[in-house]
UniProtKB/Swiss-Prot annotation:
Keyword set includes Cell membrane: no
Gene: rplK
Molecular function terms, GO-annotated: large ribosomal subunit rRNA binding; structural constituent of ribosome
Protein name per the record: Large ribosomal subunit protein uL11
Pfam hit, one: Ribosomal_L11_N
Entry's family note: Belongs to the universal ribosomal protein uL11 family.
Known partners and oligomeric status: Part of the ribosomal stalk of the 50S ribosomal subunit. Interacts with L10 and the large rRNA to form the base of the stalk. L10 forms an elongated spine to which L12 dimers bind in a sequential fashion forming a multimeric L10(L12)X complex.
NCBIfam families xref list: L11_bact (TIGR01632)
CDD domains per the UniProt record, alphabetical: Ribosomal_L11 (cd00349)
Modification comment: One or more lysine residues are methylated.
Keywords, alphabetical: Methylation, Ribonucleoprotein, Ribosomal protein, RNA-binding, rRNA-binding
Example GO BP: translation
Cellular component terms (Gene Ontology): cytosolic large ribosomal subunit
Length: 144
């Protein structure tokens, strides 16, 4: 028989840097889950990723105080900022408020990486989504 699910916890944690301090500790402590076990498991699961990369994780809490978790690909904004070589997006988006640029080939590469977790039918659809995200961040999209 399947375990009874008591809740889901969605967090964004830097790869390889899960520790019991906020936001991880309080979120898991509310459900009575073993915080240190999660930290060890998460850090082991993200061992092959770049340290510090933000990783969305969905933790499923069960009635017997056990858990399972699923890691997802980092947010689009992380990849876009990395491709453009900037620390943060524009604070004033619109015409003339560009803070960097990305090429279509970079967007296609990001789309292929993110395709698993994007709501798109094909890579071209994912690229169009990324173009919109890039423009809203103040990045100009150039051919190349």
């Amino acid at each position: 028989m399947a375990k009874k699910v008591v809740g889901y916890i969605k967090l964004q944690i830097p790869a390889g840097k899960a520790n019991p301090s906020p936001p991880v500790g309080p979120a898991l402590g509310q459900r009575g889950l073993n915080i240190m076990q999660f930290c060890k498991d998460f850090n082991a699961a993200t061992q092959g990723m770049e340290v510090g990369m933000p990783v969305p994780v969905v933790i499923t809490a069960y009635a017997d105080r056990t858990f399972s978790f699923i890691t997802k690909t980092p947010p689009n904004t992380y990849f876009l900022k990395k491709a453009a070589g900037i620390q943060k997006g524009s604070t004033a988006t619109g015409k003339g408020a560009t803070v960097g640029k990305v090429t279509m080939s970079q967007l296609r590469e990001i789309a292929q990486t993110k395709m698993v977790h994007m709501n798109a039918n094909d890579v071209d659809g994912a690229v169009r989504m990324l173009v919109g995200s890039a423009r809203s961040m103040g990045l100009s999209v150039v051919e190349g």
